[in-house]
Amino acid sequence: TVLNLTQHSYFNLSGESSGDILDHILELNADYYLPVNKKIIPTGEKRAVAGTPFDFRNRKKIGRDLYNEDDQLLLGNGYDHCWVLNDYSNGVRKISEVISEESMIKMEVFSDLPGVQLYIGNFLDGSLKSKKGMNYIKRSGFCLETQFFPNSPNTENFPSTVLEPGEEFYSKTSFKFSVK
């Protein structure tokens, strides 16, 4: 059985009606990301983040390099890519930190998985409404989806997502919130 479970929770640490998340400050513990094809599926290549808009190893605003003329950003209409997390063999470790300077809320993400997909609501079009009736517009939330690499079954050099009969699967991801 091929198994690659994740979650798709949206966050806006500045609050529901605060607009987009481009001023959120993001840090990712990843030296590589997975480039995608025109269908936004990883090609099998691992590309270094150094010197690219995908370098979040040091904290920076999500929107800082978003409008860079990078082919990968154009394919995903923004960030919709998987990062190859450092220290995968070490189990649960801190993989990310996000801060809203507006609210001073900090979110830390911990996981034992090898990848995290950053999606910044590139295709939210205002048709979804919140419980309070607010329309979710483009980039009004971000997702950090811990997972194995997308397209793993078709990519030999990616970690296997095959679960054999009798095997059990365990994974842990946690989100820690605090006020800075």
Sequence positions of predicted segments:
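An exposed, glycine/acidic-rich loop-and-rim segment of catalytic or binding clefts
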Residues: 1-180
